[in-house]
Swiss-Prot record:
Domain C2 PI3K-type as annotated: residue spans: 327-496
Organism: Homo sapiens
Name of the featured protein: Phosphatidylinositol 4,5-bisphosphate 3-kinase catalytic subunit beta isoform
SUPFAM superfamilies: ARM repeat (SSF48371), C2 domain (Calcium/lipid-binding domain, CaLB) (SSF49562), Protein kinase-like (PK-like) (SSF56112), Ubiquitin-like (SSF54236)
Source taxonomy: Eukaryota, Metazoa, Chordata, Craniata, Vertebrata
Chain ranges of the PI3K/PI4K catalytic domain: 772-1053
Location of the PI3K-RBD domain: 194-285
PANTHER family named among the record's database cross-references: PHOSPHATIDYLINOSITOL 4,5-BISPHOSPHATE 3-KINASE CATALYTIC SUBUNIT BETA ISOFORM (PTHR10048:SF33), PHOSPHATIDYLINOSITOL KINASE (PTHR10048)
Superkingdom field: Eukaryota
Domain notes from UniProt: The inhibitory interactions with PIK3R1 are mediated by the PI3K-ABD domain and the C2 PI3K-type domain with the iSH2 (inter-SH2) region of PIK3R1; the C2 PI3K-type domain, the PI3K helical domain, and the PI3K/PI4K kinase domain with the nSH2 (N-terminal SH2) region of PIK3R1; and the PI3K/PI4K kinase domain with the cSH2 (C-terminal SH2) region of PIK3R1. The inhibitory interaction between the PI3K-ABD domain and the C2 PI3K-type domain with the iSH2 (inter-SH2) region of PIK3R1 is weak. The nuclear localization signal (NLS) is required for its function in cell survival.
Chief subcellular location: cytoplasm
Subunit and partners: Heterodimer of a catalytic subunit PIK3CB and a p85 regulatory subunit (PIK3R1, PIK3R2 or PIK3R3). Interaction with PIK3R2 is required for nuclear localization and nuclear export. Part of a complex with PIK3R1 and PTEN. Binding to PTEN may antagonize the lipid kinase activity under normal growth conditions. Part of a complex involved in autophagosome formation composed of PIK3C3 and PIK3R4. Interacts with BECN1, ATG14 and RAB5A.
Lipid metabolism keyword on record: yes
Effect in UniProt of substituting residue 1070 to D/E: Loss of autophosphorylation. Decreased basal and stimulated phosphatidylinositol-4,5-bisphosphate 3-kinase activity
Outcome of swapping residue 805 to R: Loss of lipid kinase activity. May not affect insulin signaling and cell proliferation. Partially affects oncogene-induced transformation
């Protein structure tokens, strides 16, 4: 049976050749063009699911009939090459792959001599894996890119060499690191069975399951011993075995429990206890682990040979040149604005350029505006722009920002604009004219080696402006130029030449010398301390949240009392850095010296120093030094932000990129998420090279992980193809036929193999073993997400569900769910477990990704609909939810379910209020059969509530309906004790989050470059400051929250009306 989708003619040539369509059956053939080394061209009909090896044999049978066959070598001397779907030249070394999995851009295969260079083979594999050919980096001929790649290749090789000496146990710790947490929540002991754990263990290839009670403080090797004793008791003595011959593996997962940590510290066991589930283990023989280890060592040794064979020869030593430091140059900084072209404005429109020097968001001197010129193609200025700052005072990370503006008469704006949308961007109104932004571009004043830029440069600009601009410039924008040069506005700028010798920013030792020189002078020692009388004032300033602005006097006070800040208030460092005059070399030198003796900050506080406001190289190195104190689990919590702030780094080689690579290469779990966070954005032009070379470095240092990641990439490509076909044909096919066609596709061998036995990108511990095709479906929403269900082959394990989305940006969902996980962590640290359920979500590409399915759960809408015959009345049935819980729980289980509901409802009430989560209807609030309530779909956050005709549809600060209260009160109207406890939980949870308000503001600020539609400027983060009442006392803040709680309760009828409308629409569509 062939796939019954009908493709449009335009797609039939490419897409459905490799996908599944109505014209080519799964066992059908397609015409493929073959190009031989002799120049001969052959076309053959080839089965689309044939392996590369089979196709080569087919071709070889035919080449005998063509001229110059005698010039060809043996068949094994050749392999095929093609251009794949990502425009990467790929050599098909692995001949077990199917043609439909290779998916050439066009059905053309070139026969090439098999490469003997193992380095080239690795390069080809890396290019395919990261979705960007390494030849693209070579073709840039960029000295910085080449230097970084060379250093990272050496760095990766050193990491690989360090693996060679590892024991198999050390390798296991690094490859499959166990997740554990030393601190134990207070309420965990209440959920043990008389202070004991019950665990289930079975041996591989054995159906017997042994359950026994153990102490939560027992270590894993003791569990091995007890399991062996149980087996001996039942089956008698067999071969002599030792508990050290086995390792505990979590059933159904690639997760191992080993080492000296007590059982209760392992995350898996802790989760089982919290969820009242039975921890289930398999005793795996160590020899099996050793075999995996040996296979990876073989791959590692091959990689060492590959890397070393492909390393470029070292360059001959350069002659030592006399260099000058910029601190010796007291001349004003100036450039020449030569010309601009491709401005995309009418010939009569006048254009000017604004230029400014920034350090972070601080303007170092007044902006400069060029004269106004007009022109058809080129706009000629040849105009010197002199800035009010001397070269010696330029900080190392100074950036030069340009913006091109069209100058239009107010009355002629509509007729004069060619492509400008005046209403979209901020404008300057002056002297009866309006200045509209056309393009912007930024560049660093010093290059990656610290040399002051010289000579002519062409800056290809960007045309999309952010909502909020500084001085009508975009200092937070990238310093990379637009790679799409063909249509981009280009500015020709000339930096001053220095004919004698280049100017460099002083090295670190010169900076410290300068600071010592200043410190020895009488004037410097007068005012570094202020005495006790200033400390209360200083403390009040330093206690403010990160969004609070400092006035000039406050900044002077902080700088004056910098020694007091270091000794008494080390957490004041961010505010001290905002108080320094970065356009004054003396202050900068003193700060760098002070930074060397500044106490290390806790990692959570140091995160703020990676914000855009702190671009200084040594500050960021200090921040990374603080982050090194983080455990792997804590680092994973903030990895999303740490990847985003790479965009703030102006140069490729920086402390942060090295730190992330180092930790990723030391922990494969971190490595997997770093890989996907980078790869999901590698298509973005501004970061394509930066993220691409970091991905290359990770792959070179973790060749053993490449096979796992390649399997995931292949599976996601298959899902994307399937989803595209479903969307193309959803209108033509009814749901039943569409689902049948989907199942037909999934049953094909190419899809079945690609989508089976892979580690889940959402969680590397989870194995997606075998699709349960009959339960797979696509959903009704616009983008037709794929709902996939996997059977778990291991005894006693539930099925695993994942949703694949293609066409929706999941990064905002990722951010919101990360915040929910952090809230859960902070509450647990304070002894409050609110049973949160932040499910997995991962962006894996351009508007595509995966979402974890929470098993045994239903939406509020479905629960209500199933309890009523009339859709309009369903939303007002307050008994529906409680009755549903009673259907699945009784007795003590029902009491526990209501407790779970009460706690989780409190958690999500507070979380949705603090984060400003909008669009809350009955289809994006769900409940598990065990009682846990949780929210899904976070398309609107930070108070961006949906509105219609200018009227907000959501009037309540958070969702608290009477059917929720009915469950909390156990169905008893007068049960004020239960409701009072619920309210107290909400208030406690709110105050706990408020105490960590600065952390939430910092994390959102670090995401400003992510390009999320509802997080584009600092103004968006202001919502958090307001919801957490950070400018008020704790009493005032609690009073504000109590008012919001009462408002949610009082206005809950409006929620029910919205839910009724939603339920009626849903019922009508179904």
């Amino acid at each position: 049976m062939c796939f019954s989708f009908i493709m449009p003619p335009a797609m039939a040539d490419i897409l459905d050749i490799w996908a599944v369509d109505s014209q080519i059956a799964s066992d059908g053939s397609i015409p493929v063009d073959f190009l031989l080394p002799t120049g001969i061209y052959i076309q053959l009909e080839v089965p689309r699911e044939a392996t590369i090896s089979y196709i080569k044999q087919m071709l070889w049978k035919q080449v005998h009939n063509y001229p110059m066959f005698n010039l060809l070598m043996d068949i094994d001397s050749y392999m095929f090459a093609c251009v794949n779907q990502t425009a990467v030249y790929e050599e098909l070394e692995d001949e077990t792959r199917r043609l439909c999995d290779v998916r050439p851009f066009l059905p053309v295969l070139k026969l090439v001599t098999r490469s003997c260079d193992p380095g080239e083979k690795l390069d080809s594999k890396i290019g395919v894996l990261i979705g960007k050919g390494l030849h693209e980096f070579d073709s840039l001929k960029d000295p910085e890119v080449n230097e970084f790649r060379r250093k990272m290749r050496k760095f990766s090789e050193e990491k690989i060499l360090s693996l060679v000496g590892l024991s198999w146990m050390d390798w296991l710790k690094q490859t499959y690191p166990p997740e554990h947490e030393p601190s134990i929540p207070e309420n965990l002991e209440d959920k043990l069975y008389g202070g004991k754990l019950i665990v289930a263990v079975h041996f591989e290839n054995c159906q017997d399951v042994f359950s026994f009670q153990v102490s939560p403080n027992m270590n894993p090797i003791k569990v091995n011993e007890l399991a062996i004793q149980k087996r001996l008791t039942i089956h008698g003595k067999e071969d002599e075995v030792s508990p050290y011959d086995y390792v505990l593996q979590v059933s159904g997962r690639v997760e191992y429990v080993f080492g000296d940590h007590p059982l209760i510290q392992f995350q898996y066991i802790r989760n089982c206890v919290m969820n009242r589930a039975l921890p289930h283990f398999i005793l795996v023989e160590c020899c099996k682990i050793k075999k995996m280890y040996e296979q990876e060592m073989i791959a590692i040794e091959a990689a060492i040979n590959r890397n070393s064979s492909n390393l470029p020869l070292p360059l001959p030593p350069k002659k030592t040149r006399i260099i000058s430091h910029v601190w010796e140059n007291n001349n004003p900084f100036q450039i020449v604005l030569v010309k601009g072209n491709k401005l995309n404005t009418e010939e009569t429109v006048k254009v000017h350029v604004r230029a400014g020097l920034f350090h972070g968001t601080e303007l170092l001197c007044k902006t400069i505006v060029s004269s106004e010129v007009s022109g058809k193609n080129d706009h000629i200025w040849n105009e010197p722009l002199e800035f009010d700052i001397n070269i010696c005072d330029l900080p190392r990370m100074a950036r030069l920002c340009f913006a091109v503006y069209a100058v239009l008469d107010k009355v002629k704006t509509k007729k004069s604009t060619k492509t400008i949308n005046p209403s979209k961007y901020q404008t300057i109104r002056k002297a009866g004219k309006v200045h509209y932004p056309v393009a912007w571009v930024n560049t660093m004043v010093f290059d990656f080696k610290g040399q002051l830029r010289t000579g002519d440069i062409i800056l290809h600009s960007w045309s999309s402006f952010p909502d909020e601009l500084e001085e009508m410039l975009n200092p937070m924008g990238t310093v990379q130029t637009n790679p799409y040069t063909e249509n981009a506005t280009a500015l020709h700028v000339k930096f001053p030449e220095n004919k004698k010798q280049p100017y460099y920013y002083p090295p670190f030792d010169k900076i410290i010398e300068k600071a010592a020189e200043i410190a020895s002078s009488d004037s410097a020692n007068v005012s570094s301390r202020g005495g006790k009388k200033f400390l209360p004032v200083l403390k009040e300033i330093l206690d403010r949240d990160p969004l609070s602005q400092l006035c000039e006097n406050e900044m002077d006070l902080i700088w004056t009392l910098r020694q007091d800040c270091r000794e008494i208030f080390p957490q004041s460092l961010p505010k001290l850095l905002l108080s320094i005059k970065w356009n004054k070399l003396e202050d900068v030198a003193q700060l760098q010296a002070l930074l060397q003796i500044w106490p290390k900050l806790p990692p959570r506080e140091a995160l703020e120093l990676l914000d855009f406001n702190y671009p200084d190289q040594y500050v960021r190195e200090y921040a990374v030094g603080c982050l090194r104190q983080m455990s792997d689990e804590e680092l994973s919590q903030y990895l999303l932000q740490l990847v985003q702030v790479l965009k703030y780094e102006p140069f490729l080689d920086c402390a942060l990129s090295r730190f992330l690579l180092e930790r990723a290469l030391g922990n494969r779990r971190i490595g997997q998420f770093l890989f996907w966070h980078l790869r999901s954005e590698v298509h973005i032009p501004a970061v394509s090279v930066q993220f691409g070379v970091i991905l290359e470095a990770y792959c070179r240092g973790s060749v053993g992980h490449m096979k796992v990641l390649s399997k995931q990439v292949e599976a996601l490509n298959k899902l994307k193809t399937l989803n595209s076909l479903i969307k193309l044909n959803a209108v033509k096919l009814n749901r039943a036929k569409g689902k049948e066609a989907m199942h037909t596709c999934l049953k094909q061998s190419a899809y079945r193999e690609a989508l089976s036995d892979l580690q889940s990108p959402l969680n590397p511990c989870v194995i997606l073993s075998e699709l349960y095709v009959e339960k797979c479906k696509y959903m009704d929403s616009k983008m037709k997400p794929l709902w996939l269900v996997y059977n778990n082959k291991v005894f006693g394990e539930d099925s695993v569900g994942v949703i694949f989305k293609n066409g929706d940006d999941l990064r905002q969902d990722m951010l919101t769910l990360q915040m929910l996980r952090l809230m859960d962590l902070l509450w647990k640290e304070a002894g409050l477990d609110l049973r949160m359920l932040p499910y997995g979500c991962l962006a894996t590409g351009d508007r595509s990704g995966l979402i974890e399915v929470v098993s045994t759960s239903e939406t509020i809408a479905d629960i209500q609909l199933n309890s009523s015959n009339v859709a309009a009345a369903a939303a007002f049935n307050k008994d529906a939810l409680l009755n549903w819980l009673k259907e699945y729980n009784s007795g003590d289980d029902l009491d526990r379910a209501i407790e779970e509901f009460t706690l989780s409802c409190a958690g999500y009430c507070v979380a949705s209020y603090v984060l400003g989560i909008g669009d809350r209807h009955s289809d994006n609030i769900m409940v598990k059969k065990t009682g846990q309530l949780f929210h899904i779909d976070f398309g609107h956050i930070l108070g961006n509530f949906k509105s219609k005709f200018g009227i907000k549809r959501e009037r309540v600060p958070f969702i608290l309906t009477y059917d929720f209260i009915h469950v909390i009160q156990q169905g008893k109207t007068g049960n004020t004790e239960k409701f009072g406890r619920f309210r107290q939980c909400c208030e406690d949870a709110y105050l706990i989050l408020r105490r960590h308000g600065n952390l939430f503001i910092t994390l959102f600020a670090l995401m400003l470059t992510a390009g999320l539609p509802e997080l584009t400027s600092v103004k968006d983060i202001q919502y958090l400051k307001d919801s957490l009442a950070l400018g008020k006392s704790e009493e005032e803040a609690l009073k504000q929250f109590k008012q919001k709680f009462d408002e949610a309760l009082r206005e809950s009828w409006t929620t029910k009306v919205n839910w009724m409308a939603h339920t009626v629409r849903k019922d009508y569509r179904s």
